[in-house]
Design a protein with these regions (language model features):
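NTP-dependent small-molecule kinase module
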Residues: 130-189
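P-loop (Walker A) phosphate-binding loop of NTP-binding proteins
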Residues: 8
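A glycine- and Lys/Arg-enriched "phosphate-lid" helix/loop adjacent to the NTP-binding pocket
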Residues: 97-154
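ATP-dependent small-molecule kinase phosphotransfer cores
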Residues: 32-100
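Hydrophobic anchor at the beta1->P-loop junction of P-loop NTPases
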Residues: 5
C-alpha cells in the first residue's frame, strides 16, 4: 500500500509519516532522488537549490515529479508512506504551462493508494514552525502564509485521488497521528 502524507509546511507531515513507518511497519520515503542517485543530503540540496533558482516552472515541476515517479515505480507491492507526493509541487508550480507534466506523471506512474491531506490555518502552521525552530527562514516567506488547500483539493478531485482531509487545527499531535494511523489501518490493502 502506498500512502502519501500531504499538506502545507507546519501541519505535521513528517511526524505523522514517521509514526506510520514505526507503528504500522511501513517504509518511510522522503527525498527518493537521494537514494536513486546515491547522493549525500547536502549534495541533493545543492542540486535542488540550482533547479529551484531556475525561472522555468516546467523544469522545477519535472524535477520534483521525477522524485514522485521514482518513489512510486521503485516501491510497487511494498507498504510505503511518502512524506509528500505531488500536491506541494502542484501548489507551487501547477499552472497552464505545467498541467501536462502533472497529467503525464499520473497517467504513467499512477497515484498513491491513499492520500491524507493534513490541513491547518496559516497562523497555526506558522506557530508550529516557530515552536519547532524560531529561526526557520520559512517564517519570513510571505508565500508560507498562503492557505493553499483549495488548489490542492481541486487537483485531488480532478485526478480522482483516493484522499481524506484531516483538519489538524484543533487536534494535538498525538490525536493527529492516531487519526491518520487509523485511516491507514482501515484502508490497508
Amino acid at each position: 500500500m502506498i500512502v502519501a502524507i500531504e499538506g502545507m509546511d507546519g501541519v505535521g507531515k513528517t511526524t505523522v509519516a514517521k509514526s506510520i513507518e514505526k507503528d504500522l511497519n511501513f517504509i518511510y520515503v522522503k527525498d527518493p532522488l537521494k537514494d536513486l542517485f546515491e547522493l549525500e543530503k547536502n549534495h541533493l540540496e545543492k542540486i535542488s537549490e540550482k533547479i529551484f533558482n531556475q525561472p522555468d516552472d516546467k523544469l522545477i515541476s519535472w524535477y520534483l515529479g521525477l522524485e514522485d515517479c521514482y518513489a512510486l515505480s521503485s516501491n510497487k507491492n511494498k507498504n510505503i508512506v511518502m512524506d509528500r507526493h505531488v500536491l506541494l509541487n502542484y501548489f507551487w508550480n501547477g499552472n497552464e504551462n505545467t498541467e501536462k507534466i502533472f497529467e503525464t506523471q499520473i497517467e504513467m506512474f499512477g497515484k498513491p493508494d491513499l492520500t491524507i491531506l493534513l490541513t491547518a490555518s496559516p497562523q497555526t502552521r506558522m506557530k508550529r514552525i516557530s515552536d519547532r525552530d524560531p529561526n526557520d527562514p520559512d517564517l519570513n516567506k510571505p508565500t508560507m502564509k498562503e492557505y493553499g488547500y483549495d488548489k490542492m483539493i481541486k487537483f485531488l478531485d480532478k485526478y480522482n485521488f483516493n484522499y481524506v482531509i484531516v483538519d489538524t487545527e484543533t487536534l494535538s499531535l498525538s490525536e493527529t497521528i492516531e487519526k491518520c494511523k487509523n485511516l491507514v489501518k482501515s484502508r490497508r490493502i
